């Protein structure tokens, strides 16, 4: 069967990332066992060199079986394909924010209804302008006044599956994040959807679009350092 075939192809010891890339770059079918943390940089090399890279087995938490062919009957289990697209995924709300010369936020949505005590998923579409520094994170929170907030903390971009230092101009990324809505700390009623991007633990990216206090699609920049913007409103029940 194909599993036995690719496991045999993966039996050669490859000590470095470059060795793995060269192994997969050949015309003959080739496979390799790699750590999950190596998938994104290897995928980036494959994209730049224009050779295929597939994940044949992602059942292990730490190790993946990758190959340069997709055998008959096999499915590509590459998690990067869940978050990286050539065209923008369609979400409920269109918007436009640009953070410096790195990335744009072009769409967003939350699962509704948003009910206190329940878990919901938020989604954001990003358009990459260039690679971002590693460790960059996103904030997508709901806010009513000073006290009622849902999901106030920054979290990893695109589930940490494809870190932003590997992005390239023209990439579209679908960011998903599941949120537990607090039962007691949040009041019912309309909440603003606020988006920002964090560069480091102590610094945020600055908004360059819109250039003023307001922009397309009813965007409103928070006063002050131009680090956060309101892109819309949702109801919390």
Give residue spans per PLM region:
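C-terminal luminal/periplasmic domains and tails of membrane-associated envelope-modifying transferases
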Residues: 5-237
